[in-house]
């Protein structure tokens, strides 16, 4: 189950790194100078940073399933707005939405890992989640550059938005906050189980 949210973490890394590969396209399509391009890229980070404290509160209040599903939907919307928006303002909004939504992935992933895996596997699962995240960064390198050369940046980013929408649906249908919801043993600390 944590793998679904780890996939959102991967998407977040991809979205974080992608502007470096498509910088020339963004500058051309939106008539940007270097400062404006920096601001466009920074929208992701402004939102990401602002969501760190609320993320912990949200995952504790509404649960990993709801939070991850909503985050995937918002990320998909943000990516699609960024991909197909005709103005710089829309691109800013899209990047901000992406940053705010993918910011929940890491904390949510760790919350799920604490419920779905025994304590002696937590470090391994954490490492695997980091690996998935970094794969997103790798995909935003040469693979994205090749895709952009073949299909254009808007199409490549649009495809990533569509895939994120699919992830939202799968997350809502398959993810459960705790293995006990599927009849399996929970690995959550007893304090959390009795809460």
Predicted regions and their residues:
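Cytoplasmic helix-loop-helix junction between adjacent transmembrane helices
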Residues: 94-132
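Extracytoplasmic
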Residues: 1-34
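Flexible cytoplasmic inter-helical loops of multi-pass small-molecule transporters
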Residues: 176-195
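Helical-face signature of the major facilitator-like transporter fold
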Residues: 5-13, 45, 79, 87-99
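Small-residue-rich segments within alpha-helical transmembrane domains of MFS-like 12-TM solute carriers
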Residues: 13, 17, 83, 99-107, ...
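Conserved MFS/SLC helix-loop-helix module at the cytosolic interface between two early adjacent transmembrane helices
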Residues: 50-89
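Helix-loop-helix hairpin linking two adjacent transmembrane segments in secondary transporters
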Residues: 129-180
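Residue-level signature of mid-helix packing/kink "hotspots" within the transmembrane helices
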Residues: 17, 45-53, 137-138
């Amino acid at each position: 189950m944590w793998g679904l949210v780890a996939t959102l973490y991967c998407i977040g890394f991809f979205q974080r790194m992608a502007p470096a590969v498509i910088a020339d396209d963004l500058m051309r399509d939106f008539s940007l100078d270097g400062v404006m391009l920096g601001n466009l890229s920074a929208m992701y980070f402004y939102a990401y940073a602002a969501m760190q404290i609320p993320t912990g509160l949200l995952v504790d209040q509404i649960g990993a399933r709801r939070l991850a599903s909503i985050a995937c939907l918002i990320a998909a919307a943000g990516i699609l707005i960024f991909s197909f928006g005709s103005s710089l303002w829309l691109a800013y909004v899209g990047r901000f939405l992406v940053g705010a939504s993918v910011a929940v992935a890491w904390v949510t992933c760790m919350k799920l890992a604490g419920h779905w895996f025994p304590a002696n596997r937590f470090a391994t699962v954490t490492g695997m989640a980091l690996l998935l995240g970094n794969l997103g960064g790798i995909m935003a390198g040469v693979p994205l550059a090749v895709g952009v050369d073949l299909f254009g940046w808007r199409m490549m980013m649009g495809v990533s938005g569509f895939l994120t929408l699919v992830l939202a649906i799968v997350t809502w249908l398959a993810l459960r906050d705790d293995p006990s919801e599927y009849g399996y043993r929970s690995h959550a600390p007893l304090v959390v189980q009795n809460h």
